[in-house]
UniProtKB/Swiss-Prot annotation:
Gene source species: Arabidopsis thaliana
InterPro entries: Homeodomain-like_sf (IPR009057), Myb_CC_LHEQLE (IPR025756), Myb_dom (IPR017930), Myb_dom_plants (IPR006447), PHR1-like (IPR046955), SANT/Myb (IPR001005)
UniProt tissue specificity: Expressed in phloem and/or cambium.
Name used for this protein in its record: Myb-related protein 1
The keyword Lipid metabolism is assigned to this record: no
Length: 402
């Protein structure tokens, strides 16, 4: 029973739905008569297809009601008077119409465009134009960049990159050239250093040879020219003390002067004699060969100056009409100048000097020597036993010895 009733109910529902499905054809017109010209879909919420005629009637109704802002779906439905139109259909279409009105009267057909443009020109055209102008002007700076400028900028960037690459290449070439130049300089410096080392070795060899020559010369000629001044003075003092004692007389001096003719070099080395020859070249040779005697004369002159400063008695006896002593360069070749310095004890009197002068005058005539050279004899005797010394000088000029 219950099953029969349920099945019967289902049949009733199906029977009740059948006429609706038969009536709702995909596009049915109005109440089935087709007078209204409506085309509806078969969805749960049937959609209306707005044809140009239907839209034209909708626009007329909206215009009668005073425009899209004042018109409502209910008033539009009453004015149109088309059966089958619902508020849902009119409401959606009115919204679209208002949007199209706000977007400068866009319409679905060419007929609607004229009516929409007339409605838009009445109230909002200035606002829309200003807004459109602002919209058109706003994006122009960002969108209207010329393509030529962009290409020019790209070309400029590429050119700068190319220039930078060229500069880097030139720098690399210059760095390589500089490195090669420095390498060549280093090689040349090494070569010069090697040559300098060879030169230094040669210099050392020459120094060794010179030292050997000096040692040989000093061994062969142990003369005073290789000695120091102090050693020369000491040697001079020792030689003078050995040759002439402090109490030696003028006879010993004269005999020693005679011996100089026999052995001049020995006496020159021991007594400090210098033979002056008239020829200047020979005189220069003698001076260059015997520097020791020049130093002896200098030391003798210094001793004489010191004695004068200490105000000690100085006796000078001039012989042969008291002729003054002249320099050896002005004397004739046949004259002899002998300077004798006798150092005596402080306790001795001046009788010794007078006695020496008398003996010299007596022996003056016997001692005659014929010489063609000028001889300067400087004899200084130093006695270490005496506390003080009294220098005496005898200058003899104008004697020719036979």
């Amino acid at each position: 029973m219950y099953y029969h009733n349920q099945h019967q109910g289902k049949s009733i529902l199906s029977s009740s739905r059948m006429p609706i499905s038969s009536e709702r054809h995909p596009f049915l017109r109005g109440n089935g008569t087709g007078d209204s010209g409506l085309i509806l879909s078969t969805d749960a919420k049937p959609r209306l297809k707005w044809t140009p005629d239907l839209h034209e009637r909708f626009v007329e109704a909206v215009n009668q009601l005073g425009g899209g802002d004042k018109a409502t779906p209910k008033t539009i439905m009453k004015v149109m008077g088309i059966p089958g139109l619902t508020l849902y259909h009119l409401k959606s279409h009115l919204q679209k119409y208002r949007l199209s009105k706000n977007l400068n009267g866009q319409a679905n057909s060419s007929l609607n465009k004229t009516s929409v443009m007339t409605m838009v020109e009445e109230n909002p055209p200035e606002v829309d134009e200003s807004h459109s102008e602002s919209l058109s002007i706003g994006p122009q700076p960002s969108m209207n960049l010329p393509i030529s400028d962009a290409l020019q900028m790209q070309i400029e960037v590429q050119r700068r990159l190319h220039e930078q690459l060229e500069v880097q290449r030139h720098l690399q070439l210059r760095i390589e050239a500089q490195g090669k130049y420095l390498q060549s300089i280093l090689e040349k410096a090494q070569e010069t250093l090697g040559r300098q080392n060879l030169g230094a070795a040669g210099i050392e060899a020459t120094k060794a040879q010179l030292s050997e020559l000096v040692s040989k010369v000093s061994a062969d000629y142990p003369d005073s020219s290789f000695l120091e001044p102090k050693e020369l003075q000491n040697l001079h003092h020792q030689q003078m003390q050995k040759t002439y004692p402090p109490n030696s007389s003028l006879d010993s001096c004269l005999t020693s002067s005679e011996g100089t003719q026999k052995a001049p070099k020995m006496l020159d080395n021991r007594l400090g004699l210098r033979t002056y020859i008239g020829d200047s070249t020979s005189e220069q040779k003698e001076i260059m060969e015997e520097p020791f005697f020049h130093r002896m004369e200098l030391t003798w002159a210094e001793e004489e100056s010191l004695r004068e400063n200490h105000n000690r008695p100085y006796l000078s006896t001039m012989v042969n009409n008291a002729e003054p002593r002249i320099s050896s360069s002005r004397r004739s070749p046949g004259r002899l100048s002998i300077g004798v310095g006798l150092h005596e004890h402080r306790g001795r009197s001046s009788n010794n000097s007078e006695y020496t002068e008398e003996r010299f005058n007596e022996n003056n005539e016997d001692c005659k020597l014929e010489t063609h050279t000028r001889t300067a004899l400087d004899l200084n005797t130093h006695d270490e036993n005496y506390g003080t010394t009294r220098p005496k000088q005898f200058d003899l000029n104008g004697f020719s010895w036979n």
